[in-house]
């Protein structure tokens, strides 16, 4: 089984869970979803507001290396099936610069929420 097939199978389950979650929260003003490979699997809808979280590659790698489950081969395979980051940025209505400090990310999220609501 290759990675693309695995992702397809996993995303079928993600879609089901997402739809259940959205139904359960349909009366909320705003619902936030964090879904890997969202655009790649065409899960987003036109009315969705996309937020791109931008991080330095070096910072991401530092975080990944701290994980017990880090696997460089798997990371490379996932990168190969991802859409280019520039494309994802262009499709997003907002960009958060993530320097891995809670304070700055929270500030960015508050600004976005204020402009949406």
Give the role of each language-model region.
Residues 1-27:
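ATP-dependent small-molecule kinase phosphotransfer cores
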Residues 6, 32, 75, 96, ...:
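Residue-level signal for inorganic ion chemistry
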Residues 9, 63-64, 78:
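Amphipathic alpha-helical segments that mediate coupling or scaffolding at interfaces
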Residues 17-67:
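ATP-dependent NMP and nucleoside kinases share a basic, alpha-helical "lid"
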Residues 43, 87-89:
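Short, flexible turn/loop "capping" segments at secondary-structure junctions
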Residues 68-70, 78-85, 100:
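C-terminal non-catalytic interaction appendages of large macromolecular assemblies
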Residues 90-104:
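Phosphate-binding beta-loop-alpha motif at adenosine-nucleotide cofactor sites
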Residues 111-116:
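C-terminal alpha-helix
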């Amino acid at each position: 089984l290759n990675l693309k097939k695995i992702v397809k199978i996993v995303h079928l389950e993600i879609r089901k869970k997402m739809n259940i979650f959205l139904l359960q929260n349909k009366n909320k003003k705003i619902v936030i979803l964090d879904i890997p490979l969202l655009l790649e699997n065409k899960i987003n809808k036109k009315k969705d507001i996309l937020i791109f979280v931008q991080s330095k590659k070096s910072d991401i790698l530092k975080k990944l290396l701290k994980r017990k489950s880090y696997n460089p081969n798997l990371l490379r395979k996932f990168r190969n099936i991802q859409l280019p980051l520039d494309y994802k940025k262009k499709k997003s209505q907002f960009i958060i610069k993530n320097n891995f400090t809670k304070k700055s990310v929270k500030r960015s999220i508050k600004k976005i929420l204020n402009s949406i609501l």
